[in-house]
Amino acid sequence: MRKLKSLVCGSKFGQFYIDAISKMKECVEFIGIFSNGSERSRLCAEKYNVNLYTSIDKIPEDIDIVFIAVRTGVMGGDGSELALKFLSKGIHVFIEQPIHIDEMKKCVKCSIEKGVFFHVANFYKYMDTVHKYIECSKGLLRKNEILSIECACANQVIYSLLDNILRIFREKARFSIENFWIQNQDFFIASGSINDIPLSIKVYNSVNTVDSDSYCYYLQQINIYTSEGMLFMVDVNGPIIWKPQFRAAHDLFIKKGDELDQRIFDSKMYWYESESELSYKDIFCKKWIDAIKKEIKEFIDNIYFEKMTEYRRKIQSEIVIPSIWGLITQK
């Protein structure tokens, strides 16, 4: 199969995409960076030995994929506008979250008309910890009654959190957000339900004016309460904790072992670490890059194997994410 000619728009978070696709030479031909010509962009182009484009008219017509890592329209950028321009030319688009529901609908409509793929990124679900948590949660759904879901996240990743929750329910989710509480200037809580299961999301809403991407207490936490215990993901890099329900041993010292409720002895806490002991440097340079590569590879496989029917089905279920994201963030 031929290599797909690829362009990255943006060099801030775009650096992660640049590094990831530069390590995918078996399927990607990295041809350049499109940006406003910042010093960072120039240095990136030099390091990876690719062209730097500052005018969209100068970009070659024969590119296959554009990775857009600049703010979308709803966030004050031109990412959504760029996506539509490239999609209208028959170019596949892979764009960073978040995106407004109206912007997404336009992009999806254009992609289907042109027979190309449009994807809103969420590399977190490809990290070892998040992937493990989603799979364990699916198992809980099959075997236990889910009583409640409590989440917490930074404002910047509400969109990705909603996508991760959607994966737990195998893309068959009915979201509802009904109530909001402002705790103080830094935190608010949105509550509602998913498939009639109570859902709450605590959002850290404080943004540092110097560096809006930093100084978060956490990126994403998810805590699922079931009839047998709770499954807690402390953050996207772990750990994951399974804590069974507490059961009192009222007759522990007066009855024989086989006369006691065996669940008292069988129940124990499990702790899954994987990435939680790594430094942030290791997480950024290794785990994030690996996760981005996995997501890009899946996107490229859709292109190679022309999975357009599957794409149309999945993208319709994903439209719920910007809809609920909009409800939460407009408050």
Kindly give the residue locations of the regions a language model identified.
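Short hydrophobic segments within beta-strands
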Residues: 7-9, 34, 69, 121, ...
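Short glycine-rich anion-binding loops that position phosphate/pyrophosphate groups of nucleotides
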Residues: 71-73, 123, 206
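A contiguous active-site-proximal alpha/beta segment in oxidoreductase catalytic domains
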Residues: 100-164, 316
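C-terminal glycine/acidic-rich active-site capping loop/insertion
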Residues: 230-311
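Rossmann-like dinucleotide-binding domain that binds NAD(P)(H)
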Residues: 144-228, 236-237
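C-terminal helix-rich "cap/oligomerization" subdomain common to oxidoreductases
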Residues: 3, 8, 45-47, 65-70, ...
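Beta-loop-alpha module in the N-terminal Rossmann-like domain of NAD(P)-dependent dehydrogenases
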Residues: 17, 48-110
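N-terminal Rossmann-like dinucleotide-binding module
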Residues: 1-48
